[in-house]
Amino acid sequence: MSHAGAIAAIGVALIAAALFSAIHKIEEGHVGVYYRGGALLTSTSGPGFHLMLPFITSFKSVQSTMQTDEVKNVPCGTSGGVMIYFDRIEVVNYLIPSAVYDIVKNYTADYDKTLIFNKIHHELNQFCSVHNLQEVYIELFDQIDENLKLALQKDLNSMAPGLVIQAVRVTKPNIPEAIRRNYELMESEKTKLLIAAQKQKVVEKEAETERKKAIIEAEKVAQVAEIKYGQKVMEKETEKKISEIEDSAFVAREKAKADAEYYTSQKTADANRLKLTPEYLQLVKYQAIAANSKIYFGQDIPNMFMDSSAGPSVQSATLLQDDSPALNEPAVGDE
């Protein structure tokens, strides 16, 4: 009985071991590939639990999401013969799930060693071999990342379609200590030069600001002077216009006054011309004679009252006053 129990226990253990080896789990972001007898099977599996034939089938989980591969301590010889070392180069990449089978078949599940690590060494040495230390360490260092990315992706597009390089990050290389000190001194001098140049620019900027300020002040003074001059000109023009208006008004008044006097004189003359008729003049003459207390003697005295036309030709008689002695003498025929 004990022998049969032992056999049963062994059988249960074998079945449990078979089930344990048959059930496996694939994590999210991974693709499972299977090997049977060392041969890669065409079937792949996604995330979750899966079954496989125990003992004769094995699997590997291949990451298909974004991952970062680090390539460390990469030697690089420049065109000048200086050996430098890049401490760390990071390659960010991801694998398209549909391309997992082909890439694993051609480059195994550790495809990154062949397609990324070795390729980084090759491309970086190619870059260093055609550039000197100054270019690699300073002038072209900012281009190394992009150049490596483009070179890797170009080769992968033909060798392993489906493997995508997202980014490449390269650290500053280590150079010999003596050269590094020289570069530090050079950078220090360059920094001093830049500081001096910046100070010079600041001084020039301040001078330019002062010059512009002076120009603005001068323009301001000129504009104020121009405005004042314009005001004076306008005042003079206003005074001139006022004077012209006053002169015009005075001329108009004088002309109106002269016209009025002329009109009055003309009307007076017309009235006199109409008034001084021969009859009126005769009446005035009679009135003057009647009002005159003087006595005129002469042969033409009667004619004064008989012939008005002889008025201008009448000879003047001897004028005697009322109190003259001749008036008191008797006439010759009175005796």
Swiss-Prot record:
Any GO BP annotation: cholesterol metabolic process
Ranges annotated as biased composition (Polar residues): 310-321
Keywords, ordered alphabetically: Cholesterol metabolism, Endoplasmic reticulum, Glycoprotein, Lipid metabolism, Membrane, Signal-anchor, Steroid metabolism, Sterol metabolism, Transmembrane, Transmembrane helix
Membrane topology according to the record: Single-pass type II membrane protein
Superkingdom assignment: Eukaryota
Residues carrying sugar: N106
CDD domains on file: SPFH_like_u3
Topological domains, Cytoplasmic: 1-2
CC annotations in GO: endoplasmic reticulum membrane
Parts of the chain on the Lumenal side: 24-335
The organism of origin for this protein: Xenopus tropicalis (Western clawed frog)
UniProt function note: Mediates the endoplasmic reticulum-associated degradation (ERAD) of inositol 1,4,5-trisphosphate receptors (IP3Rs). Promotes sterol-accelerated ERAD of HMGCR. Involved in regulation of cellular cholesterol homeostasis by regulation the SREBP signaling pathway.
Cell compartment(s), UniProt: Endoplasmic reticulum membrane
Protein name per its UniProtKB record: Erlin-2
InterPro entries hit by this protein: Band_7 (IPR001107), Band_7/SPFH_dom_sf (IPR036013), Erlin1/2 (IPR033294)
GO MF, one annotated term: ubiquitin protein ligase binding
Family indicated by similarity: Belongs to the band 7/mec-2 family.
Region (Disordered): 310-335
TM regions (residue ranges): 3-23
Lineage of the species this protein comes from: Eukaryota, Metazoa, Chordata, Craniata, Vertebrata
